[in-house]
């Protein structure tokens, strides 16, 4: 442990804050083109086939992003908008695709939390 005099001579250094979504480059969202749409399995205690897409962004980055909701219409060459936000049980997936924007359709027959899934108000 340093003495007070040592701390006066050379103060403690702050740890640099790590950027959790580097591909967005401080933007709220980014547009990109799907290069591959596939399913993957989650980490140990969970079991499912999670839908993900590899997306090439307009800034040149290529990222893996999660497709939320039940069912989707995405395929290769679909233009999508991505936002930050990781999926805890999928390692390497740090972005979400926004539903109901550009080529991505909203979730069909969604009644609650519709704004998160790009679903229109039911009649």
From Swiss-Prot:
Nucleotidyltransferase keyword on record: no
GO MF assignments: rRNA binding; structural constituent of ribosome; tRNA binding
One GO CC term, this protein: small ribosomal subunit
Pfam families hit by this protein: Ribosom_S12_S23
Keyword tRNA-binding: yes
Region span, Disordered: 1-21
Alphabetically ordered keywords of this record: Methylation, Ribonucleoprotein, Ribosomal protein, RNA-binding, rRNA-binding, tRNA-binding
Gene3D superfamilies: Nucleic acid-binding proteins (2.40.50.140)
Biased composition (Basic residues): 9-20
Residues in the signal sequence: none
InterPro entries, sorted: NA-bd_OB-fold (IPR012340), Ribosomal_uS12 (IPR006032), Ribosomal_uS12_bac (IPR005679)
In-chain residues carrying the UniProt-annotated modification 3-methylthioaspartic acid: 89
Biological process, per Gene Ontology: translation
Matching NCBIfam families: rpsL_bact (TIGR00981)
Family recorded in the similarity comment: Belongs to the universal ribosomal protein uS12 family.
Its job: With S4 and S5 plays an important role in translational accuracy. Interacts with and stabilizes bases of the 16S rRNA that are involved in tRNA selection in the A site and with the mRNA backbone. Located at the interface of the 30S and 50S subunits, it traverses the body of the 30S subunit contacting proteins on the other side and probably holding the rRNA structure together. The combined cluster of proteins S8, S12 and S17 appears to hold together the shoulder and platform of the 30S subunit.
Quaternary structure and interacting proteins, as annotated: Part of the 30S ribosomal subunit. Contacts proteins S8 and S17. May interact with IF1 in the 30S initiation complex.
Protein name: Small ribosomal subunit protein uS12
């Amino acid at each position: 442990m340093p003495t007070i005099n040592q701390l006066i001579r050379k103060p403690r250094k702050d740890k640099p804050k790590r950027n959790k979504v580097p591909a967005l480059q401080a933007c709220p969202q980014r547009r990109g083109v799907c290069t591959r749409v596939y399913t993957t399995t989650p980490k140990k205690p969970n079991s499912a086939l999670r839908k993900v897409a590899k997306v090439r962004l307009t800034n040149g980055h290529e990222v893996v992003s999660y497709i939320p909701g039940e069912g989707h219409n995405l395929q290769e060459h679909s233009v999508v908008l991505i936002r930050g936000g990781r999926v805890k049980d999928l390692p390497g997936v740090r972005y979400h695709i926004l539903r109901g924007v550009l080529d991505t359709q909203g979730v069909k027959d969604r009644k609650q939390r519709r704004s998160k899934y790009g679903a229109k108000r039911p009649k």
